[in-house]
C-alpha cells in the first residue's frame, strides 16, 4: 500500500485528501477511490485533466509513494485574449507606449 494525495482547488477553497491505495494504482483510479468527484459536482469526470506534482499526466499513469494528484479546472479565459486586454489597459493608463506597446520613454 502507498499513500497519495488528491487535490482540487477552487478560487476560494481547496480540498486535499490523503488516501491509501494499492501499489500499481493509476491516477484515474485513485481519483475515483478518493471520492473527491462526489464532493465536488463541478468536476467533469468525463473530461478530467490530471497532473502529478504540477506535471500533466495520462490517467493510466501508475502512482508512486507520496505522489500528489492534481485535478485541473478548464481555463476560463483564452490566454491570448487576456494578454491583449491587459496590453490595451496599460496603453490607456499610460503604462505602455500607444504606438509600440512597449514601455513609455521617460524624459
From Swiss-Prot:
This is Protein RnfH. It comes from the Bacteria. The gene is rnfH. Residues 82-107 are annotated as: Disordered. Belongs to the UPF0125 (RnfH) family. Gene3D superfamilies: RnfH-like (3.10.20.280).
